[in-house]
């Protein structure tokens, strides 16, 4: 039976003025609006993992094209028309949370987790550093999705059920506004990646989000790709649905999964590194036999770029054991499987190529050569968010 009486349900969250919501992968797209309405009433910021698809939704009164907080977007010509816009969704958290001085300032009274834990290591470390915080974990199976071991209340419920039964209105927006100011600063900084003159994963993602059709679906590969999306795929700028294969063997079947998505005949994209593509190259054969359409955005840095950011960097045999360069010519792979192929040498070429490929059938590989070490430097440059602590306090 329901262990919470109606009175207890109303009191559970009413006692907290600072509630933080974590929205991770494995949230059904049909439940996103419930999370949104729940958070708005609670004045609770949502740290939305890109694979949660909570970033797809916005409601009037958020951040305009100049990254300014606006109070009424009905009269704001800079806002995207006919889109729901929300100011509770936070998408640039992994950048500004690099400043650990923010962690105690952003400490809530209560954390609510929907779906799996977010991919951001900084968010996990920040939450793990907080003591005496209620941590409510919601999932329909009672499987623990919280690797930090911070859960104080584990509730078996669907998201729709929980957000309906435990809805409460919070009159104080002070905590939410603190996160919103950081989001403005984060977007202002990260958006400058679109001006990067060299091929860079961050610029690709910004271009992709702005130029693919709203009804698109994107499979996001593992390793650095999903983490780059965490940085550069902003809230409220696309209705595209993001998918991912997360887990220990998440690299398995990347191409095949993307082609499976393409069977619904929606515009479908795969954004991947070279190792993930190489791992499931034979999956391309399925496209021809089933007449499937797929655009593959291949960032080819000839190896595993994520290890440039990990402690293994600089160790003996690093390139051989971790970077695992393959030195493959993917134009040959495209020819082998009957795919279209374009290799770009300048980021300015991407948008015209995307437009051209959208009118073609079959699989098309757009190869973007990048450099692992230089990408790491650019990553540091574009994700360095300056925070005014005095204004925040």
Question: What residue spans do the PLM features occupy?
Answer:
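Glycine-rich, anion-gripping cofactor-binding loops and their flanking helix/strand elements
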Residues: 23-136, 238-263, 267, 279-281, ...
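Terminal amphipathic helices with adjacent charged low-complexity linkers/tails
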Residues: 135-137, 141-177
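Active-site diphosphate/adenylate-binding microenvironment
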Residues: 180-265, 387
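Thiamine diphosphate
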Residues: 228, 233-393
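Conformationally flexible catalytic loops at phosphate/diphosphate-handling active centers
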Residues: 1-14
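Short glycine-rich anion-binding loops that position phosphate/pyrophosphate groups of nucleotides
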Residues: 25-27, 51-52, 116-119, 223-225, ...
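Short acidic-hydrophobic, aromatic-tinged amphipathic segments that line or gate anion-handling sites
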Residues: 89-93, 152-164, 341-346
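Active-site donor-nucleotide binding/catalytic segment of nucleotide-sugar enzymes
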Residues: 13-29, 191-198
């Amino acid at each position: 039976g329901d262990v919470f009486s109606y009175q207890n349900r109303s009191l559970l969250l009413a006692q907290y003025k600072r509630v933080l919501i974590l929205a991770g992968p494995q949230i059904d797209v049909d439940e996103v609006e419930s999370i949104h309405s729940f958070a708005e009433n609670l004045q609770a910021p949502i740290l939305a993992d890109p694979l949660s698809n909570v970033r797809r939704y916005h409601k009037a009164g958020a951040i305009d094209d100049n990254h300014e907080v606006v109070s009424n977007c009905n009269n704001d010509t800079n806002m995207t028309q006919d889109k729901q816009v929300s100011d509770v969704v936070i998408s640039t958290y992994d950048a500004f949370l690099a400043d650990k001085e923010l962690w105690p300032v952003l400490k809530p009274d209560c954390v609510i987790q929907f779906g799996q834990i977010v991919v951001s290591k900084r968010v996990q470390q920040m939450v793990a550093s907080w003591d005496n915080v209620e941590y409510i974990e919601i999932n329909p199976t009672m499987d623990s999705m919280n690797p930090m071991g911070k859960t104080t209340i584990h509730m078996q419920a669907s998201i729709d059920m929980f957000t309906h039964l435990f809805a409460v209105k919070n009159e104080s927006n002070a905590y939410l506004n603190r996160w919103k100011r950081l989001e403005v600063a984060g977007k202002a900084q990260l958006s400058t990646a679109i001006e990067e003159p060299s091929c860079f994963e961050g610029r690709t993602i910004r271009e992709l989000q702005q130029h693919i059709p709203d009804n698109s679906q994107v499979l996001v590969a593992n390793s650095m790709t999903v983490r780059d999306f965490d940085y550069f795929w902003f809230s409220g700028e696309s209705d595209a649905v993001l998918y991912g294969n997360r887990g220990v063997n998440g690299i398995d079947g990347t191409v095949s999964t993307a082609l499976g998505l393409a069977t619904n005949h929606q515009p479908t994209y795969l954004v991947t590194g070279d190792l993930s593509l190489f791992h499931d190259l034979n999956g391309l054969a399925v496209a021809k036999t089933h007449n499937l359409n797929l655009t593959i955005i291949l960032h080819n840095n000839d190896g595993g770029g994520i290890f440039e950011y990990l402690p293994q960097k600089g160790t003996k045999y690093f390139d051989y054991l971790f970077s695992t360069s393959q030195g493959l010519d993917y134009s040959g792979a495209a020819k082998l499987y009957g795919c279209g192929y374009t290799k770009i040498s300048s980021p300015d070429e991407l948008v015209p190529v995307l437009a051209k490929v959208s009118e073609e059938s079959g699989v098309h590989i757009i190869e973007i050569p990048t450099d692992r070490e230089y990408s790491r430097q650019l990553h540091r440059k574009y994700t360095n968010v300056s925070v005014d602590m005095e204004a925040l306090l």
